[in-house]
Amino acid sequence: MDIIGGQHLRQMWDDLADVYGHKTALICESSGGVVNRYSYLELNQEINRTANLFYTLGIRKGDKVALHLDNCPEFIFCWFGLAKIGAIMVPINARLLCEESAWILQNSQACLLVTSAQFYPMYQQIQQEDATQLRHICLTDVALPADDGVSSFTQLKNQQPATLCYAPPLSTDDTAEILFTSGTTSRPKGVVITHYNLRFAGYYSAWQCALRDDDVYLTVMPAFHIDCQCTAAMAAFSAGATFVLVEKYSARAFWGQVQKYRATVTECIPMMIRTLMVQPPSANDQQHRLREVMFYLNLSEQEKDAFCERFGVRLLTSYGMTETIVGIIGDRPGDKRRWPSIGRVGFCYEAEIRDDHNRPLPAGEIGEICIKGIPGKTIFKEYFLNPQATAKVLEADGWLHTGDTGYRDEEGFFYFVDRRCNMIKRGGENVSCVELENIIAAHPKIQDIVVVGIKDSIRDEAIKAFVVLNEGETLSEEEFFRFCEQNMAKFKVPSYLEIRKDLPRNCSGKIIRKNLK
């Protein structure tokens, strides 16, 4: 079943501008309180100007352009401007540091970067130290450094016409984005996302929360994440609704933003719910228009009930990952919800629980959650330049192995049991244990290292490092945490350190992580 009808993203935006015209499409609020608003017509014009900017800088169909930005209008302009000319967006997690960002640049083959002044010094260092393919950097800030190969995004964009100058042939099978996501291996993998994937995500996610053109969808989720892009932005735009993008989450400001913009739909992760609950109660807690709060794992029933009662909302559970593009299992609009179930499989998908031999399990038995979709359409196409990793998780007939465990009941409701192997869920970020262990192992005093996730009342899981030192060495907590802060993103830095004489291992020599939790 083809619900896209051959419509790529360029056609989508041209149609949206024609149909919705002066209706508000996008509202962006910065951390400083600056608000920018764009109608569908204005937003399409900004997207066209941005596409023309990239064309003048030599970007053509198939070229990769990296974005290292916080939530801002420029992210939206670039995302769809690149898509209009057949180029490929490579969003970089705005919290990553030098080594991690450089690795993504190198492995994505990005030739141009759009970033802001706060991240520019890091990329100066990367260009000096690493052999990347970067030809040019665009800065979104007004003030520019006196460096060659750097230009002002805003100045260049404003010089461009509002109609598209370069319109190569496009197909819905063309790649629109490569989104690097942490996995169970030591390095992130590039998830290849097509025009069809994004168009489908818009229709599917709009269906999931019954979006209409009079809705206002507010999110504080980072734009470089799949949930902001495919659950929120694509859904809102596909429905002709208004999309509100807040630069950064603030527990103190969030409810006021929901009220100010008269949001009808928003999304929350457990860390947000917990920090909202510790804010002082207010008589305005239920003074809002929210009808759905999209929710992602993992919350106790007591926490859920307390949140819903205090704020007068209901949670719409959704389960998915970058590779599934959308929440392929979830609550359905208008249907009964069965907590703590993660819901039922959505349209265009199949879901099974399978055993270690890849055989389907009956209701009530725990196994791996597996999803069947169409690669490049309803699930990701492949891992970029990594056929071995693709083959490991994606079968030829479209069955995707999530690596997560769960079970289903007799009525088709699914239940999540545990996270995928060696992953830590920390405040909405997926952190690979192996990646951290490889970084920490480079410390000259450390002989052996393992990191595990331990329960945290606010951020789902905290990171604890267990280390064995080289003989005769001593290591202070201050020295250890300073080393981590210098070599990894802040959200990956362990919260706890324990120095041990040895680590528990099985007969194969593998560390038994569960003995350390």
Swiss-Prot record:
Domain of life: Bacteria
Known EC number: 6.2.1.48
GO molecular function: carnitine-CoA ligase activity; crotonobetaine-CoA ligase activity; medium-chain fatty acid-CoA ligase activity
SUPFAM superfamilies assigned to the protein according to its UniProt record, in alphabetical order: Acetyl-CoA synthetase-like
EC category: ligase
Role: Catalyzes the transfer of CoA to carnitine, generating the initial carnitinyl-CoA needed for the CaiB reaction cycle. Also has activity toward crotonobetaine and gamma-butyrobetaine.
Protein name according to UniProt: Crotonobetaine/carnitine--CoA ligase
Lineage: Bacteria, Pseudomonadati, Pseudomonadota, Gammaproteobacteria, Enterobacterales
Gene (UniProt): caiC
